[in-house]
From Swiss-Prot:
GO terms for biological process: lipid A biosynthetic process; lipopolysaccharide biosynthetic process; response to antibiotic. Signal peptide: none annotated. Residues 314-660 are annotated as: Dehydrogenase ArnADH. Pathway: Nucleotide-sugar biosynthesis; UDP-4-deoxy-4-formamido-beta-L-arabinose biosynthesis; UDP-4-deoxy-4-formamido-beta-L-arabinose from UDP-alpha-D-glucuronate: step 1/3; Nucleotide-sugar biosynthesis; UDP-4-deoxy-4-formamido-beta-L-arabinose biosynthesis; UDP-4-deoxy-4-formamido-beta-L-arabinose from UDP-alpha-D-glucuronate: step 3/3; Bacterial outer membrane biogenesis; lipopolysaccharide biosynthesis. It catalyses: UDP-alpha-D-glucuronate + NAD(+) = UDP-beta-L-threo-pentopyranos-4-ulose + CO2 + NADH; UDP-4-amino-4-deoxy-beta-L-arabinose + (6R)-10-formyltetrahydrofolate = UDP-4-deoxy-4-formamido-beta-L-arabinose + (6S)-5,6,7,8-tetrahydrofolate + H(+). HAMAP family: ArnA. The active site is at H104, E434, R619. Homohexamer, formed by a dimer of trimers. NAD(+) binds at D347, D368, I369. The gene is arnA. This is Bifunctional polymyxin resistance protein ArnA. (6R)-10-formyltetrahydrofolate binds at H86, L87, I88, R114, V136, K137, R138, A139, D140. It comes from Shigella sonnei (strain Ss046). One of its GO terms (cellular component) is membrane.
């Protein structure tokens, strides 16, 4: 049976050996180049492939159309993935008639995502396992073909558990691969209500927070012990690594992080005490705890800390242009919730951000980006991250004021982009789902979908092409001049503070705001061309969490990426949106203050938007880049978003002159 294999690490090697032992014909193997910053304690898939005479490749992006075509030419009957680190696109998965199967290091649906080996130890689990499952578009979500349980002993650390999982994986594959070969497998769907998902871990995630219980810190030490980077702490500015530890039920009134004794080296925790059995100062050698205490100059009563004592982290300065807008004000709230951001904002109004004006880490200037160019250039130079969120983004304006859309959305933003290039600042640019235009793909993909717009005499597309050209300019600056950038494409974000009812009164608002105004005023809900156009609606909280993770940029994974941010599960037509909104309105406690529902009315787009308008029938995002770069999934159901958005707007209405 012909197969193409995607593999890395020890699991990749044993998976390849198991396939060969089971009589599979491996046409090609795809793997990764080794990261020089990573301690390579595991087997080399590339070396194994070379020794076995199998073609092996390590492309940066295996999902590129050229690689998809090359894999198609191999005509695989089945595809296997053994610890390959990138998501494989649906186009590749569909190439194998017998399907694609992935080996995952947990008992799915628990511990989907990255680093399950480490996470089960961090969380103090007593059991894990390996799962072979069918691959689908969503990571680790396909039907289970086989599982094998593995007990986690109290003295297991990451490497011993890794060896146990490898042994279990060999057994699992020996039992299961012949059945797959003969088409004789029983698949069990995963229970979504039991699913848990965990993200990528970095060495910086393993600092010891002494206010936590000793058992929790001991589990952290176990989870990242050698050959992983190790759990760490600081004495003053001196970093040290803890390689092994023991939990002591020591009752002490000492502050967490205090040294209780140096022989043994015992540290007070939020609950109990942690004995540091072995450790290492800086880049030195491993030594026992009491010697480490001597090396670090510790005495009874000394204090350890999770961060260097004199290097308080400078807050990251974020410049948000259009800070009073829908995305800007919600993003400001999310950033200020953390203690390491300083937000600088500019906008022509401040009603949505009034709640932040007295915050010590929020700095606001009221002004227009077309006028305050010197202020903007100064703050681009001063800040670390720039988000130019100013744009005209309401469809009626595309036909009503196309030149103003071009001047603001393109020309003003191009100037800001050039400032970022000049001062070498990171830019996070709001592209738009509109750039996909009339694309016919089932899922709009950032890296593969064509961007299709209408003729020049349809000014409705001026917003789309302005944004698209800026995307291309930013990409070119990144390629040619090293601009650090991320492009994000929101798909129909909704929530409180989206537009306002006054904007809806002049037709310059998004769909849901216009529909709410119709309900508030007792006017018919207008369904443009019947309202059959489908969109994927995304809760603002989900969207902002993804955007926050782009700003955080863990491991620089977002650099040079284009990321759709939308909820493909929340697809509905505008008509269905209106019906859901109406149902929510009818049961709202303030309903009796408003006129009776005036019904739905179908209108032609030309009579509503004017000459030059074209609509898009569907717009559904692929979110594989968001999953890969951000470890992000949208979580909030559309009905909840509708209820909260409606409630917000109804409570802004002056009810003194409304019927009761």
């Amino acid at each position: 049976m012909k197969t193409v294999v995607f593999a890395y690490h020890d699991m990749g090697c044993l998976g390849i050996e198991a396939l060969l032992a089971a009589g599979y014909e491996i046409s090609a193997i795809f793997t990764h180049t080794d990261n020089p910053a990573e301690k390579a304690f595991y087997g080399s898939v590339a070396r194994l492939a070379a020794e076995r005479g199998i073609p092996v490749y390590a492309p940066d992006n295996v999902n590129h159309p050229l690689w998809v075509e090359r894999i198609a030419q191999l005509s695989p009957e089945v595809i296997f993935s053994f610890y390959y680190r990138h998501l494989i696109c649906d186009e590749i998965l569909q190439l194998a008639p017998a399907g694609a199967f992935n080996l995952h290091g947990s008992l799915l649906p628990k511990y989907r995502g990255r680093a399950p080996l480490n996470w089960v130890l961090v969380n103090g689990e007593t059991e894990t396992g390996v799962t072979l499952h069918r691959m689908v578009k969503r990571a680790d979500a396909g039907a289970i073909v086989a599982q094998l349980r593995v007990a986690i002993a109290p003295d297991d650390i990451a490497i011993t558990l890794h060896h146990k999982l490898c042994h279990a994986a060999r057994q699992l594959l020996e039992q299961t691969l012949p059945a797959i070969k003969h088409g004789n497998i029983l698949e069990i769907a995963q229970r979504e209500n039991e699913a848990t998902c965990f993200g990528h871990r970095t060495p910086d995630d393993s600092f010891l927070e002494w206010h936590k219980p000793a058992s929790v810190l001991h589990n952290m030490v176990r989870a990242v012990a050698d050959p992983w980077p190790g759990a760490f702490s600081y004495v003053g500015n001196q970093k040290f690594t803890v390689w092994s530890s023991r939990v002591h039920p020591h009752a002490s009134k000492a502050q967490p992080g205090s040294v209780i004794s140096v022989a043994p080296l015992l540290i007070a925790c939020g609950d109990g005490a942690l004995e540091i059995v072995t450790g290492q100062a800086g880049d030195g050698i491993t030594m026992q705890g009491s010697q480490l205490a001597q090396m670090l100059g510790l005495v009874q009563g000394s204090r350890l800390n999770s961060q260097p004592a004199c290097t308080a982290r400078r807050r990251t300065r974020v410049l948000i242009l259009g800070v009073n807008g829908f995305i800007g004000n919600h993003l400001t709230e999310r950033l200020l919730r953390e203690d390491h951001y300083e937000v600088y904002g500019l906008d022509i109004g401040s009603d949505a951000i009034s709640r932040f004006l007295n915050h010590p880490h929020f700095h606001f200037v009221e002004g227009d980006i077309s006028i305050h160019s010197e202020w903007i250039e100064y703050h681009v130079k001063k800040c670390d991250v720039v988000l130019p969120l100013v744009a005209i983004a309401t469809p009626i304006e595309y036909t009503r004021n196309p030149l103003r859309v071009f001047e603001l959305d393109f020309e003003e933003n191009l100037r800001i982009i050039r400032y970022c290039v000049k001062y070498r600042k990171r830019i996070i640019f709001p592209s738009t789902s509109e750039v996909y235009g009339m694309c016919s793909d089932k899922y709009f993909d950032e890296d593969h979908s064509n961007l299709i717009v209408g003729p020049v005499n349809k000014p409705r597309w001026i917003y789309s092409v302005s944004k698209q050209l800026l995307d291309r300019v930013i990409w070119a600056y990144g390629e040619k001049e090293g601009l650090q950038f991320t492009l994000f494409r929101p798909f129909n974000w909704m929530g409180p503070r989206l537009d306002n009812l006054n904007a809806a009164r002049i037709g310059s608002s998004r769909a849901i705001t216009q529909l709410i105004l119709n309900l508030v005023e007792g006017s018919p809900i207008k369904l443009i061309d019947g309202g059959k156009q489908k969109r994927c609606f995304t809760d603002i909280r989900d969207g902002i969490e993804a955007l926050y993770r782009i700003i955080e940029n863990a491991g620089n994974r977002c650099d040079g990426e284009i990321i759709n941010i939308g909820n493909p599960e929340n697809e509905a037509s505008i008509e269905e949106l209106g019906e859901m909104l109406l149902a929510s309105f009818e049961k709202h406690p303030l309903r009796h203050h408003f006129p009776p529902f005036a019904g739905f009315r179908v209108v032609e787009s030309s009579s509503y938007y004017g000459k030059g308008y074209q609509d898009v029938e569907h717009r559904k995002p692929s979110i594989r880049n968001a999953r890969r770069c951000l470890d992000w999934e949208p979580k909030i159901d559309m009905q909840e978003t509708i209820d909260e958005t409606l409630d917000f707007f109804l409570r802004t209405v002056d009810l003194t002159d409304k019927p009761s």
